[in-house]
Regions:
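Catalytic-core "active-site belt" of small-molecule-metabolizing enzymes
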Residues: 2-201, 238, 242, 252-260
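A conserved acidic, glycine/proline-rich C-terminal tail/linker
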Residues: 206-238
Length: 260
C-alpha cells in the first residue's frame, strides 16, 4: 500500500469515527477498482473493527465496461447491523454528507468446502438464511455517488448499516424475482421493482462477493450478511425521515434516519 492510499483511508476513518463531513475528496481519486480496494482495505486495517457483512452494489454501463466489473462491495460493521423489533430502527447518517436508503434481500453466508460458487444456483448452497431488509448508505463525502464507483469503493462502499427484517422461507428462494418490492419515504412511494431487474439477482451478488473477497485474501465467515443490491433504486434520504420497504407476501421493514 502506498502512503497516499493510507492517507485517504485515514481521512475517511477519522471522519466516520467523529461524524464529520469532508467537503472535498481527501486526496487523488482512485481511477481503477484495484486502487480503490487498496484504500478500503487500509481503512479496515485502521479500524480493527468486527465485520458483520458486506454490501454489494451495481456498477452501471459504461463504467462497468471500463472498470471490468458490474458490481462493487464494501464492509458492513457488526455494530451497524440491526434486527427489526417492535419500534422503528434508528440509523445515524451524515447530515451534510451523502445518505440514501435501499430495499434489499439480505443473505447470510454459510461457507462450504471446495471451489467458490460460479453461478447463482451454486451460491444458494453458500447461504443458510435470507431476510428482507434495508441498507443505509451514507458517507461523509457528499459527492461520493457523483464521483463514481471507484470513489464509492474507497469510502467503505458507502455503507452505514443494515436492517434485518422477516425471514424468507427456503421454498421461496427460487422465486425471489417474483416478489414485488416497494419503498416509501415519509409515506410517498419512491420506487417499485423486483430482483428480476438486478443482473443475476441476490445469489449472483453473493457469488460476486465471494470472488471479490478471495481476490483480496479475505476468508468469508459464517454468519456474515450480504446486502445483495438495491431493488427499487438508491433513494436519497435526510435525518428525521422514515423509510418503509414492503416485500409482497413476505412482510415489511422500516427505519428512521437521524443525524450522526
Amino acid at each position: 500500500m502506498n502512503s497516499a492510499a493510507g492517507d485517504i483511508a485515514a481521512a475517511f476513518v477519522n471522519a466516520r469515527r467523529n461524524w464529520k463531513t469532508l467537503p472535498e475528496y481527501p486526496g487523488e481519486r482512485p481511477s481503477d477498482l484495484r486502487s480503490a480496494y487498496v484504500i478500503q482495505d487500509a481503512a479496515l486495517a485502521d479500524w480493527n473493527r468486527p465485520i458483520g457483512g458486506w454490501k454489494v452494489g451495481k456498477i452501471n454501463p459504461p463504467m462497468s465496461d471500463e472498470l471490468g466489473a458490474n458490481r462493487l462491495v464494501g464492509p458492513v460493521f457488526a455494530d451497524t447491523v440491526q434486527r427489526e423489533g417492535q419500534d422503528s430502527a434508528q440509523f445515524p447518517i451524515f447530515a451534510g454528507g451523502f445518505a440514501a436508503i435501499e430495499a434489499e434481500f439480505m443473505l447470510r453466508l454459510a461457507p462450504q468446502e471446495g471451489p467458490l460458487p460460479a453461478t447463482r444456483e451454486a451460491a444458494m448452497d453458500w447461504v443458510d438464511e435470507v431476510r428482507i431488509g434495508l441498507e443505509v448508505a451514507s458517507s461523509p463525502y457528499a459527492a461520493i455517488n457523483v464521483d463514481g464507483p471507484c470513489v464509492t469503493v474507497s469510502d467503505h462502499g458507502n455503507n452505514a448499516g443494515l436492517l434485518l427484517g422477516a425471514c424468507v422461507d427456503r421454498t421461496e428462494w427460487e422465486r425471489l424475482d417474483d416478489i414485488a418490492v416497494s419503498l416509501q419515504i415519509d409515506g410517498r412511494e419512491v420506487g417499485r421493482a423486483s430482483t428480476a431487474t438486478m443482473l443475476d439477482g441476490p445469489f449472483g451478488a453473493a457469488a460476486f462477493l465471494l470472488r471479490n473477497l478471495s481476490d483480496r485474501g479475505i476468508a468469508p465467515e459464517a454468519g456474515w450478511w450480504v446486502s445483495s443490491g438495491a431493488i427499487t433504486g438508491v433513494h436519497e434520504i435526510a435525518p428525521g425521515q422514515r423509510a418503509i420497504a414492503r416485500f409482497a407476501g413476505v412482510g415489511q421493514t422500516e427505519a428512521v434516519m437521524q443525524a450522526g
